């Protein structure tokens, strides 16, 4: 892959204006399209097949008024006055609401069939509205006529009266950004300028990240017309896209600047930077992408959609870094080259810097380091035992939001339970006295602990479904309300035995419990998926057993610490002022699984960027301790800069973030800080020091079955080092190439125009042909075939080298005639050529290739090749022999 990325980087550098124009055109096209055709966000939280959701769906069919989209107007009279004094104005407003086309029904506070719409003090009243927007979430423009009626009512009431709109229709808090989030980008710019040593260079990662986020957001806004997208999704994607977009560009750009400092040509440097660091970026992005798509394990639609769009944002960030960034490098050209160091500075002996000092401390005292870090992180994890989760509600919005104002007024004048009423539905089709039955159920429910009131208990018009509205004593995110839901569910068997009716409990809190239970159930399989993926990926990358185990344990410590810190601040209220939190509150239900997914990808990024350099030092002959220290000093500054940037981006989404995103941003900021600085840059060197040589041990059987990932562009580095090898004009040059158990070490050289025979047992002969054409993995030596280096560029060899085994074709003549030959052609089992047509087809093929390529004819023995004029015959060595040339 690194060779392909190298070519992509150079192409984008050369075609810079075209690439830049394409990306900016795509951004403009999607932006305009989104502005013209975007839909609205939907904050409906649903779980198909859950009992509460099925009850709600059934209610929509049998009692549509009870399940319709709702809104309410809260009217609060001035201190010392009663709303009854302004009944005429309120009733007129009810009529005005009723006249609006989207209002199915407007219920007056003095409706004789509904209780609880006037507060006990008489100072506040509620106007209930049932709305119909065709099943779609309403936009602010669609709600404007309703809001206008409320404003007119407030103007008609005595001075000091408050009229606020709230309820389900107004609970959608639209995503917004403020100047505070921009501070994170300013900090990122400062860090980039320090690391890269240039303000111009520092601006490139910001430009690419913002472009990528803009494209992803425009696409998301456009698709709101097709998909139900939660309002948390865009801010999550913006936050994540900016963080990874800047980091990915930093890794590539820092490599480019280092290479320019060493005197490399800018175009060549761009290609190498994309081929080497770009390989790590692809791996890093892929891990985050897979983890985000893994959120679908929970089988909760809104969470799956959130994961998909966040994953798309990360994918766009990766592609932008691999294409748009090298194009911008090409635009700046030599201006990206750092100023050369003075001769005096170059000769001055370097003093150990802070990174050398820090890794020295951790590796000199590994046991103390491990005990201290683990103890601190376990202690920080303990508050997670009290972690409270809930779905978003208006009470978690900013104080200036209309829905939040209405929420607070309802809590103050009617009690907190009015903001989260429960609905009990009853199947009363077999009842002969539906009104009496509903009255009995109402009396039973009013006697349950935690019930404040039952304002409504009525059958529908067909008398087959009953609806009971239950107002708890506590708010929707209070654990006591969840206890009440369970108490109502426990009474279902009693009501079936007593009244012969089946009942269900639904409403926001009931759905919340179902979602929380389903998310809790999904945590284990998702955790197994993440941990399993971590072990396999890192074992494949580092060819080690202990490195992935250590990395996974570190990831779990980071996740636990992030959970604990989030519970401490948001649930317990410790230092809540720091995050601009008014009061302790639950965090959004899907935060745990979301944090696990995102932090997994980010943790693997830092592990790969840091430990791969240590492994490189070890492979090149340094002792384990020297490799740890050298790798840390070399990669630590970039990893630290990347972590600081990511923390800054996340942290500045906290102060002004909407309720759900505030907790998510805080948890991610803490998680990244813990993982980067305590786990990867402190715990990892200490653990690797204790492991010593064992850190890089991998059983041979596991080494054979694991895939190989070239995350640091080692293949490209090898190809660059051997770009002139063998340098003799050959089209095929093999040096001790071998396949364990199949082909012994072989040496072979072909120049353009050569036609040779290769003989030997089927295994050795065919194995050699497959290995030389990139179709069989080699275990020793190397070769260059048609310009492709083996074993590194086996894919390129397969594209450039043709292989045909006549033992597997029905008509050799037709197969040979239809063949599109590559630079080198291997024809196996030529002894099967018997017809004149097949001989003619082979001669024609040889003539087509002979000009600038070579042909190898393979057979069991040399006698089968006598019909062809050959430049020589080569005996393919089997693995059991050392013979290399006939």
Task: Locate each region found by the language model.
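A short helix-turn-beta junction within AAA+ P-loop NTPase domains corresponding to the substrate/partner-engaging
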Residues: 867-884
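Structured non-transmembrane domains adjacent to transmembrane bundles in polytopic membrane proteins
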Residues: 49-70, 79-164, 386-576, 608
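Membrane-embedded transmembrane helical bundles of large multi-pass transporters/channels
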Residues: 1-39, 103, 122, 133-389, ...
